[in-house]
UniProtKB/Swiss-Prot annotation:
Protein name: Cellulase/esterase CelE
Signal peptide: 1-34
Annotated compartments: Secreted
InterPro entries associated with the record: CE2_N (IPR040794), CtCE2-like_dom (IPR037461), Dockerin_1_rpt (IPR002105), Dockerin_dom (IPR016134), Dockerin_dom_sf (IPR036439), GDSL (IPR001087), Glyco_hydro_5 (IPR001547), Glyco_hydro_5_CS (IPR018087)
Region called Cellulase, residue ranges: 35-354
Region (Esterase): 490-814
Amino acids binding Ca(2+) 1: 415, 417, 419-421, 426
Family of the protein in this entry: In the N-terminal section; belongs to the glycosyl hydrolase 5 (cellulase A) family.
Amino acid sequence: MKKIVSLVCVLVMLVSILGSFSVVAASPVKGFQVSGTKLLDASGNELVMRGMRDISAIDLVKEIKIGWNLGNTLDAPTETAWGNPRTTKAMIEKVREMGFNAVRVPVTWDTHIGPAPDYKIDEAWLNRVEEVVNYVLDCGMYAIINVHHDNTWIIPTYANEQRSKEKLVKVWEQIATRFKDYDDHLLFETMNEPREVGSPMEWMGGTYENRDVINRFNLAVVNTIRASGGNNDKRFILVPTNAATGLDVALNDLVIPNNDSRVIVSIHAYSPYFFAMDVNGTSYWGSDYDKASLTSELDAIYNRFVKNGRAVIIGEFGTIDKNNLSSRVAHAEHYAREAVSRGIAVFWWDNGYYNPGDAETYALLNRKTLSWYYPEIVQALMRGAGVEPLVSPTPTPTLMPTPSPTVTANILYGDVNGDGKINSTDCTMLKRYILRGIEEFPSPSGIIAADVNADLKINSTDLVLMKKYLLRSIDKFPAEDSQTPDEDNPGILYNGRFDFSDPNGPKCAWSGSNVELNFYGTEASVTIKSGGENWFQAIVDGNPLPPFSVNATTSTVKLVSGLAEGAHHLVLWKRTEASLGEVQFLGFDFGSGKLLAAPKPLERKIEFIGDSITCAYGNEGTSKEQSFTPKNENSYMSYAAITARNLNASANMIAWSGIGLTMNYGGAPGPLIMDRYPYTLPYSGVRWDFSKYVPQVVVINLGTNDFSTSFADKTKFVTAYKNLISEVRRNYPDAHIFCCVGPMLWGTGLDLCRSYVTEVVNDCNRSGDLKVYFVEFPQQDGSTGYGEDWHPSIATHQLMAERLTAEIKNKLGW
């Protein structure tokens, strides 16, 4: 605990030099002397002068530069509930040694708050928070504390505003009072990612109502802190946008409380999303385009805020481990350099979780051994921020292996403790296992029971499924339907429209057609015959590999080698569209390994009917002025594929660039969508048997080419659209049909297309077909970049997928 020395004579001597301050001494003081602007004790040791300095928020953030999050600790129900050890001062010292200058200490208060009207915080919990804060400050670092996972009661809607605000103010009154005499090395953050949980716009900037209420929450908290006395009238305070997002819609509506100069904007930016957060996204980062894109995003924040005198802290960023260390290192250095050079401090999200290849592996520090899992990333952050570490990092030498389960009869999936029931105890135990809080389960069959999706791995995917089961959003686990991979029933799952009439191998053409299989061994190769320049993506054990092409030839391609010997999962995905030619898979080879049983088809099925947008035309391109190149068409990262993955569904994509309902792009001759739709192989005239794939959902995204260069006749367009819906309804009588518009149209073309499609939907509803819906995608405005020829970027596809996912969930309850 700090000792505050109140010595009138010393203050009188120094007040004219240093202004108002507190003096912190590490030991009892027996005498003083002044040396220049320094206060020394009797032994000549400098006493640290700490007070609310005359420093701007911009300059303070420049001092911070680079920070670290003590994640999944005090923001858990209890400090060690999520598998991390109890925080020690040695842990914080280790962070300081590497050059980090600040620690964000997320705190969840919910389970430590008493009833209304006082909402008294448990004294022991508040004491523990203060103890950890002191660890940070004693190391000469900045600390940030907040109200973190309290979204269950901080609800930004008008209906809940008053109740939420009353509790929030009471909580902050107590926090602010406890810390009121701390100096400006302690910062407050009003809330963490405030949002309306479960709403369609939760992660899309929120609704106007959400943003308006969040502004009122921020104002109430800032006013409460300012009125609490001590140094809090000058305390630096962070305020977030809706969900702390950097989306324009959220930034535009953010109101700075009282235009207070000591208020700092709080943003979270795991950018780019598909590299940083999406386990199924790209594992590579480092191209000139990648760097320019990230720099552009930071420029936008700088120009909006910092350039105009408003400080910004990116309180959370980071990248998950996809066995791609070199890309993560390059990204970390570039991110830190570009942010810090613009006066923006950045804080790595370290949740303590380490399981390479899993979706939550953000940990840098091994908190148990006080060594570094990824010293290369830490060093890259410091190089980027221009910080010299105090010591060289000690790496953590080994990885934690994931156990391979042995099949046992009568397994109750989810019952990890073996008590014959599936409940919250099992869920907590599974989370602790994943976070390495425990090394084994009480039940001998716990390892098998924990793998509820039967992918031979125990990770956060299993935890999400467990939570869904307990919340009754699913009634059984995928493992209950899956086959155990073995050599007795080898096979391949074909997803998409395939023709099996040629004994040499199946053929396909449409975007997103893919083969999925399990194999045992260390390597895998495939032989492909392609009629044009087709590009493919292999995903092995959930990790996307670099794409490759087979261009109008037959080629054998080594997909992967050097794997640990054992069972592996492989998806081989056709990235390019049908117009680039048909593809034939002539066989797989696994070296000394073998093909295992085919994966079980997903129960949920979605069919997408569209044009170049659904094909993902040019979504990996670097410029809207760039012409189409097959390499940059990645249907795996299309809104269609992303939506399907979001919903644990398969996707059949029937899409063709430039195609329309009544006219093709620019009036080009050739078949329209109704001419293409019935075929498995559109060039060979092989028709599709619609009974082979009966989706619960059909998504139609057509009209862009009917309204781009000229405008379709209303009667013809409406009639053609209704004919397509009739064909879909004839093939799939019970399907939910989502009729979409966007995101490439604008002006009159957009207005007409929207009007006509809405009319079609309304006519269907009036005629008794209530399973036809209208969806408008966010229209692109350049804020998320462009692909080739003005087509949507991957970031735009993600926004489209978020919108469509929310709509489907809302209508079907998925």
